[in-house]
Amino acid sequence: MSYTEQLQRVVRNYEAAGNQLPATAHDIALWAIENGLWEPQRSTLVDRCAEEIARAMREEFITDPQGRRVRVKHVATIEKNGKQAAFWADMRQAPREHMATAFQQRRQQIVGDCRQLKWDMDSYNQNHNIGEPIQMVFDFTLDLEEIEALAAIA
């Protein structure tokens, strides 16, 4: 059983113990720890620390010379010695290759998010929506132009 499946079982146990959803993940985690269903392993603590460091890097912004608020640290998943790892770099010193990879991977994440949104919307429209189908436009060209036009006059 994978770690994710173990955690899903914890949620089922939470419900089976008479706790109802909706609930926060924090409440479920507290219940799991209090009931001895989850203990942090050293690797879990290292992973948690790494996630928090990554979040902090993801949230570091500067204002560039043109006045744009831009993210400073960028991650690219790269294979080295037969293993994939996420490497972070500061865009002010990063090699062009790293930045090109990071930007392309972020674009692919956006495409994946759009695909999932479309599937969710289509499923809702086909299986649960009793009204007019919810429509979504996935061409962001006009959105980007509008945002940039507003920024230019601000």
Question: Residues of each region from the PLM?
Answer:
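Short alpha-helix boundary/capping elements
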Residues: A32-R42, I53-R58
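Alpha-helix N-cap/helix-initiation sites
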Residues: T4, A17-H26, E39-V46
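Phospho-regulated, low-complexity intrinsically disordered regions of nuclear gene-regulatory
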Residues: M1-V10, L45-A154
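Structured catalytic/translocation cores of nucleotide/phosphate-coupled proteins
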Residues: A16, I33-E34, W38, I147-A154
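DNA-recognition alpha helix
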Residues: V10-N13, T24-E39
